[in-house]
């Protein structure tokens, strides 16, 4: 199946907003085994939009339009598609009720006739409810071509795609089953080299590597009759892949940490903390609270995290954590001594089971004769205090801080697995 994405909105063409919807939708279509062949952006102009829809209909099986579902006159996506398909616009009862409920809590003057446009769908289409906004989406197939209309704001589009469109497309088109393997501690180039024979000779299942900031994923996909057969085929391939060794001789399974497109090292670590009923604290220098804010982003974080420290300067490390200032000056803040001391003192001061610390050089300049990207991460438990040195070279200041937190989460994750004799 060939799909085409059409982004509607003059603000995209003028550079006022970035079309992140295209990336999101392309990834979702890939998960479903639907190939996106074309992406187009068009302004809020009926004539040009009609031209784009006509072209897309001649070369694609699935046409997805994003944006232009709002209440203003330049929101004309549904109106233009209806004109092209020679269909009427009708009101969706559920969307109308949502409009009524929304404006019932507001001044009567805030509702205008234009708002009613948001509850319209093309006659004969399947409505796609909007759980985070007012503009209803829709799905319709005419003459063998399927059309989808989606709202433009990502906060509305993503839930609609995940909860409404993906299940709908899965039932109608997809026979592709996928499993995403996540790796940390190995680069894409090395992973591809280690698995080159699998990748070069792949048929079914297929293997697709993706490099992300600080980590790599492998998407394993197969076309088969049902989930059970897919699980068997993908499981066999996974076992073969993870039995390989890195170029340093380390088992590939050691740098594999989890499954899923939306998973992360932070989530894996958080879930292990909850599972094993452990609490954690952190003392951060170069990351300035990034580790703690990431941890706190998960619902239920208070089960495992009560608080921590951000000690950016040497003086604050001494003042807040009780580390000897003269020793800090002697060893430097970019050192194993400081990292281990920060982790242990944070743990003792809060009574947490685990203390973690991050100190180093975010860049771009050197610090204490250490190059940018030099990071020490400390970890303290009741029985042990340790640290690792990480070099994150050739990265921006933002990336150094982010990747440093990934290393910290991975260190905590491995510690938890060791404590439970699972690693």
Curated annotation (Swiss-Prot):
Q: Pfam families annotated for this entry? A: CinA, CinA_KH, MoCF_biosynth
Where does the source fall among the domains of life? Bacteria
| Record field: transmembrane | none
Q: Which InterPro entries match?
A: CinA, CinA-like_C, CinA_C, CinA_KH, Competence-induced_CinA, MoaB/Mog-like_dom_sf, MoaB/Mog_dom
Query: Which protein family is named in the record?
Result: Belongs to the CinA family.
Q: What is this protein called?
A: Putative competence-damage inducible protein
Q: Which organism is it from?
A: Streptococcus pyogenes serotype M2 (strain MGAS10270)
As recorded in Swiss-Prot or TrEMBL, the protein's gene is named: cinA
């Amino acid at each position: 199946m060939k799909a085409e994405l059409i982004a509607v909105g003059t603000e995209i063409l003028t550079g006022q907003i970035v079309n992140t919807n295209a990336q999101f939708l392309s990834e979702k279509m890939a998960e479903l085994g639907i190939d996106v062949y074309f992406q187009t952006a068009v302004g809020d102009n009926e004539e040009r939009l009609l031209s784009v829809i006509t072209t897309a209909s001649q070369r694609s099986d699935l046409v997805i339009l994003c944006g232009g579902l709002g209440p203003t006159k330049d929101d004309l996506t549904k109106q233009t598609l209806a004109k092209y398909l020679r269909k009427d616009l009708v009101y969706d009862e559920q969307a109308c009720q949502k409009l009524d409920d929304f404006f019932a809590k507001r001044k009567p003057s805030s509702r205008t006739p234009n708002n009613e446009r948001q509850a319209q769908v093309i006659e004969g289409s399947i409505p796609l409810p909007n759980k985070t906004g007012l503009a209803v989406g829709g799905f319709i197939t005419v003459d063998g071509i399927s059309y989808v209309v989606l709202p433009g704001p990502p906060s509305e589009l993503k839930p609609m795609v995940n909860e409404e469109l993906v299940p709908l497309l899965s039932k109608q088109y997809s026979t592709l089953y996928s499993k995403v393997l996540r790796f940390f501690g190995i680069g894409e180039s090395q992973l591809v080299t280690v698995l080159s024979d699998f990748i070069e000779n792949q048929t079914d299942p297929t293997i697709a590597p993706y490099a992300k900031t600080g980590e790599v994923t492998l998407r394993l996909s197969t076309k088969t009759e049902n989930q059970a057969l897919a699980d068997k085929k993908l499981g066999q391939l996974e076992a073969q892949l993870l039995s390989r060794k890195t170029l340093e001789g380390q088992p590939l399974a050691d740098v594999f940490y989890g499954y899923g497109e939306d998973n992360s090292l932070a989530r894996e670590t958080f879930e292990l903390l909850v599972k094993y009923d452990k609490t954690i604290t952190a003392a951060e220098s170069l990351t300035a609270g990034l580790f703690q804010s990431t941890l706190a982003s998960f619902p239920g974080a208070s089960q495992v995290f009560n608080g921590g420290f951000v000690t950016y300067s040497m003086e604050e490390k001494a003042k807040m954590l009780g580390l000897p200032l003269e020793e800090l000056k002697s060893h430097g803040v970019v050192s194993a001594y400081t990292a281990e001391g920060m982790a242990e003192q944070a743990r003792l001061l809060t009574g947490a089971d685990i203390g973690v610390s991050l100190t180093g050089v975010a860049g771009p300049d050197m610090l204490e004769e250490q190059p940018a990207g030099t990071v020490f991460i400390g970890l303290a438990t009741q029985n042990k205090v340790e640290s690792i040195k990480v070099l994150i070279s050739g990265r921006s200041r933002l990336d150094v801080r982010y990747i440093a937190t990934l290393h910290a989460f991975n260190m905590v994750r491995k510690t938890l697995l060791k404590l439970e004799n699972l690693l």
